């Protein structure tokens, strides 16, 4: 399908003519996403999301297209935007628009466009409102909460701390000028949010602790079949894909620094070591640092690594992990990139005044006053999505199966979830894993009743306690 009905104009994509290509890749992805497709089949007749109006803010990729079409197959209406200005796959967005789903996503969109699109996914053509949010990084959730606060006290928009906040605050001011209750009305209609990633989850917990969160949230990120698979195994494949596509660098023999040794850092370090890099790790947490050391990685500080390493990867979820003084001391042609959700892990703002030379889209030389150049990938945003196509379909099937289950759970059992941040129960985590195993022809051992009694668990599971660390 390369065109939409003449009266359907509720979308913004780069080129609708790419829809045919996108549809072909979606069909391939479906064969690699067993968990998500099994859930689509299981609930197709019941239609548990009938009546759900979902605002989706998540990378508009081929894999996300399969998620969107699963949600609609289960009865939901959906409006979608990407959660990152560089992560959209234009052919995926075109295919979704051609199917009649409102989508607003263009690879390389401006910050102004980004926040415009994030507003538009809350605006339904019939004047109705979204009742669910599916978020990645928390921007859709943030927009409604911050906007509602600004309705009461516009001074919350007085001091932007970054260029992105400046653009966001301006967008909120403009919307309030035309509709003073735009945010609070939409905020009140939301039943809940399901959050995809570590950074967004941190935001939710902070909002809840401050008493600011206005609806329940399910923390999808901390489902085992998300964080221990998407974050680790997904990054293990997609990080080096992005670095290689961007630079064609020979990784073997280089010193590569991984900043942060959580699940994303673990996968990133494994990937770089598999290509025979000398991998160093920076960490603040002594437990994670000890894990890195026991895996054979050298644990150092950024202050030490800055002038010695060849490749730098941030994956901490923190702020200014690589500062200006670090970059000023780096080698000529050092490669600097980020695989954490937001672009502020690297202090890109501090080097914006220098000369930039675009090598190709999302690959820039930043030229320092002394003539030294570093290679900055995706302008400090997600390198695997900015410079490549993100995680493989198979691992995203686990994450998106969790998202779909979480949407069903919150939408159909809203009364069971007072305002707070929740995780999915263990038996649903195990269900996703079972569905995924089928694709790999794995043979799962069945627990005998006497064995189950011996260790005190049901034959059918769940098999681990809630606090078990995988």
UniProtKB/Swiss-Prot annotation:
Q: Pathway it acts in?
A: Amino-acid biosynthesis; L-homocysteine biosynthesis; L-homocysteine from S-adenosyl-L-homocysteine: step 1/1
- Any idea which UniProt keywords this protein has? Cytoplasm, Hydrolase, NAD, One-carbon metabolism
InterPro entries reported for this sequence = Adenosylhomocyst_ase-like_sf, Adenosylhomocysteinase-like, Ado_hCys_hydrolase_NAD-bd, NAD(P)-bd_dom_sf, S-Ado-L-homoCys_hydrolase_CS
SUPFAM superfamilies documented for this protein: Formate/glycerate dehydrogenase catalytic domain-like, NAD(P)-binding Rossmann-fold domains
Q: Which reaction does it catalyse?
A: S-adenosyl-L-homocysteine + H2O = L-homocysteine + adenosine
Which cofactors?
Answer: NAD(+)
Identify the SMART domains for this entry. AdoHcyase (SM00996), AdoHcyase_NAD (SM00997)
Predominantly, its location class is cytoplasm
Name of one Pfam family that matches: AdoHcyase
Q: Which residues bind NAD(+)?
A: 197-199, 231, 260-265, 283, 318, 339-341, 384
| Biological role | May play a key role in the regulation of the intracellular concentration of adenosylhomocysteine.
What is the protein's name according to its record? Adenosylhomocysteinase
- Which species does this protein come from? Aromatoleum aromaticum (strain DSM 19018 / LMG 30748 / EbN1)
């Amino acid at each position: 399908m390369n065109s939409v009905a003449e009266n359907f104009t509720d979308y913004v994509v780069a080129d609708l003519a790419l829809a045919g290509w996108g549809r072909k890749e979606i069909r391939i992805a479906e064969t690699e996403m067993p968990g998500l497709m099994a859930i689509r089949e299981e609930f197709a007749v019941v239609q548990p999301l009938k009546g759900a109006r979902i605002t989706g803010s998540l990378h508009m990729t081929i894999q996300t297209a399969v998620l969107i079409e699963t949600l609609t197959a289960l009865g939901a209406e959906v409006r979608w935007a990407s959660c990152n200005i560089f992560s959209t796959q234009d052919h995926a967005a075109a295919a979704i628009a051609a199917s009649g789903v409102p989508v607003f996503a263009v690879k390389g969109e401006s910050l102004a466009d980004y926040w415009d699109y994030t507003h538009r996914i809350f605006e339904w053509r019939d004047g109705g409102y979204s009742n669910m949010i599916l978020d990645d990084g928390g921007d859709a959730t943030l927009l409604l909460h911050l906007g509602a606060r600004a309705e009461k006290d516009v001074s919350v928009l007085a001091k932007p701390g970054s260029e992105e906040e400046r653009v966001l605050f301006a967008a909120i001011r403009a919307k309030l000028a035309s509709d003073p209750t735009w945010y609070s009305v939409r905020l009140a209609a939301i039943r809940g949010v399901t959050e995809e990633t570590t950074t967004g989850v941190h935001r939710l917990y902070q909002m809840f602790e401050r008493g600011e969160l206005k609806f329940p949230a399910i923390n999808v990120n901390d489902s085992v079949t998300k964080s221990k698979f998407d974050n680790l195994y997904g990054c293990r494949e997609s990080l080096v894909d992005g670095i290689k596509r961007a630079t064609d660098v020979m990784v073997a023999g280089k010193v590569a620094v991984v900043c942060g040794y959580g699940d994303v850092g673990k996968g990133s370090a494994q990937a770089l070591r598999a290509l025979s890099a000398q991998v160093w790790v920076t960490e603040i947490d002594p437990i994670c640092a000890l894990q890195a050391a026991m895996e054979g990685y050298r644990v150092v500080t950024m202050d030490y690594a800055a002038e010695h390493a060849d490749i730098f990867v941030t994956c901490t979820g923190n702020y200014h992990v690589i500062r200006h003084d670090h970059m000023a001391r780096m080698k000529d042609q050092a490669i600097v990139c980020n695989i954490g959700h937001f672009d502020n892990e690297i202090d890109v703002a501090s080097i914006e005044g220098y000369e930039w030379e675009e090598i190709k889209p999302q690959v820039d030389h930043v030229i320092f006053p002394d003539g030294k150049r570093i290679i900055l990938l995706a302008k400090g945003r997600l390198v695997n999505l900015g410079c490549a196509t993100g995680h493989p379909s198979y691992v995203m099937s686990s994450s998106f199966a969790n998202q779909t289950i979480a949407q069903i759970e919150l939408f159909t059992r809203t009364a069971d979830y007072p305002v707070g941040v929740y995780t999915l129960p263990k038996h649903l985590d195990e269900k996703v894993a079972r569905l995924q195993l089928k694709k790999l022809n794995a043979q799962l051992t069945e627990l005998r009743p006497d064995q189950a009694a011996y260790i005190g668990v049901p034959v059918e599971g769940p098999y681990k306690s809630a606090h078990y660390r995988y």
